[in-house]
Regions:
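N-terminal leader/targeting and accessory segments in enzymes
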Residues: 1-104
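Phosphate-binding loop of NTP-binding sites
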Residues: 99-202
């Protein structure tokens, strides 16, 4: 099912995460296919999230050149970014709510794949990786990589992507992409490490 920008705007507004949206007159016809906060991996139809202490307005320019159809930003950057992209649909959150808005937008754009997975989060000071790997082995039994996706500091496997991650708990767009991949591949479980730092961000 194709999702549209108008639906995302309504979804975030219902959760009181948007201060306002601008240049969204055609939102009902703008299809969404993904969301990212890294301008280097933006694809056509993606929403670009303008975030981070090191964010530069040039990142938005780059994202738009590679196909971003809208952007999500904090209120403190809205005027600066509108000057760069005066006709591009903008979703504006308070500075305090930007991370939550990014997480909720990521869930919406990927179709809430967590609803079709059994989610298992593992946190603690020591033993998260060991526990996640043992749990996957138990759940998969004699069929490795057939039932259980994993996200952790040692390995990420979602049925499509497989490798070593950059962070124990990825940013929301990446996390939800892995969940969506696991759902697409028919996996049943997601065993993921959850860092204590990630839990601080609500």
């Amino acid at each position: 099912m194709t999702l549209y920008l108008s639906g995302l705007i309504s979804y975030l507004a219902e959760k009181n995460l948007l201060v306002r949206s601008k240049h969204c007159e055609d939102a009902a016809t703008i299809a969404l296919y993904g969301i990212d906060h890294d301008s280097r991996i933006i694809e056509p139809g993606h929403v670009f999230v303008c975030k981070g202490a090191a964010f530069k307005s040039e990142f938005l320019k780059s994202a738009l050149e590679t196909g971003a159809v809208a952007y999500l930003c904090a209120e403190s950057h809205a005027a600066e970014l509108e000057a760069i992209a005066p006709t591009v649909p903008a979703l504006i959150a308070t500075d305090a709510n930007l991370r939550r808005a990014m997480a909720e937008a990521s869930a919406y754009v990927t179709g809430h794949p967590d609803h079709n997975l059994t989610m298992i989060g593992i946190t603690g000071t020591k033993g998260k990786s060991t526990t996640a790997c043992m749990l996957r082995a138990i759940l998969d039994g004699d069929e490795p990589y057939e039932k259980t996706a994993i996200m952790g500091s040692i390995e990420v496997f979602d049925g499509i992507e497989h490798g070593k991650p950059d962070n124990t708990t990825p940013e929301a767009p990446e996390l939800w992409r892995h969940l969506a991949n696991a759902q697409k591949c028919g996996l049943t479980y997601m065993a993921m490490e959850v860092s204590s730092q990630a839990l601080k961000y609500d």
